[in-house]
A protein has these predicted regions:
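Glycan-recognition and catalytic cores of secretory/periplasmic carbohydrate-active enzymes
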Residues: 1-149
Length: 149
């Protein structure tokens, strides 16, 4: 990956979604191949995403890097449009990687935003449910939970 993630063909733009979907793809590769290099790389990139996009005071990812000065405000995207939002995808990724402490903080923050933006956050709702099921010790993956016989 040449040590840097880019948005599309741009060498300068990058968003949390770029990280979130790459991490998701690496998690899927690990699930299919059981090759730990994919899981290790997903954890490394997740840590980078936490450093670049995660706002500690709000326990949520902002859309653009924290250090960028190209906009007048720090956008936080929690709504789904044509693709799931980056915060919901990162919550799913953190759970899949076993980064439960980070996932718990993000889950609680997204849960607070739900009261304001319920209609725009279907992926966040599914991500929070997924986190809560795994956190409770259930055997789940991104397709759902298995019932014990």
């Amino acid at each position: 990956i040449n040590d840097k993630i880019y948005h599309s063909y741009s060498k300068e733009l990058v968003f949390i979604e770029d990280y979130a979907f790459l991490i998701n793809a690496l998690n899927d590769l690990y699930d299919k191949t059981m090759n730990f290099k994919y899981k290790d790389l997903a954890k490394k990139i997740s840590s980078e995403a936490l450093n670049i996009f995660y706002i500690q005071e709000k326990n949520i990812f902002q859309k653009n890097p924290k250090g960028s000065n190209d906009v007048f405000f720090n956008p936080i995207d929690i709504g789904d449009n044509t693709i799931p939002n980056g915060n919901a995808m990162m919550l799913i990724n953190l759970v899949r990687l076993g980064m439960i402490k980070e996932a718990k903080k993000l889950s609680e923050s997204l849960n607070g935003y739900l009261n304001i933006y319920k209609n725009h956050m279907m992926t966040s709702l599914r991500a929070i449910d997924y986190f809560n099921e795994v956190y409770a010790g259930k055997n789940c993956n991104e397709e759902g939970c298995k019932l014990d016989d």
